[in-house]
Amino acid sequence: VSQTPEHAVHEQFEEQLPEHQLADFLLTDCGNICSLTGQAFDTNPLFWLRSMDCAGRLAPAEARAEARVWPDDTWQDAFKRGILLSSAKITPLERRENITRLDVLSPQIPAPVRPLYQLWRDGQTSQLQLAEERGRYGKLQQSTDAELDTLRQQQQFLRDQLDTTTRK
């Protein structure tokens, strides 16, 4: 049985460390995060994560106003816009339009950002599914309420008939 010397294990571990370090945006002021542009920001998932965090802190009206500033002709601007609007209590139709627009631009999203984008997109899709389920539940509730009303009316009619028959 051969054992690997400890220094060989340590060397293997060191080889697995990433070559590039990423800037951390945890302390970046939310008021400035959207103004940061360039490849160093666009390819850094921590930048996008901080953007999501900052967008989540905005009031819905403020998020909508900020989103209007960003066009959606590049993946970066469309993603910023989508992130802002996702916190703005948008309608399912608006959410679907954002997802569709970003789907068109998603092949341009760099590999380091793609997993974060996919998680964000999955969350947006879940929000759409939730809205659809709520809609179905609402329709089912209305239909059930209508059926119950009909049954109550029938029950009352039958009771009235029973009372009439019993009196005779």
Language model features with spans:
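N-terminal globular core domains of eukaryotic regulatory proteins
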Residues: 1-125
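Long, leucine- and charge-enriched amphipathic alpha-helices
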Residues: 126-168
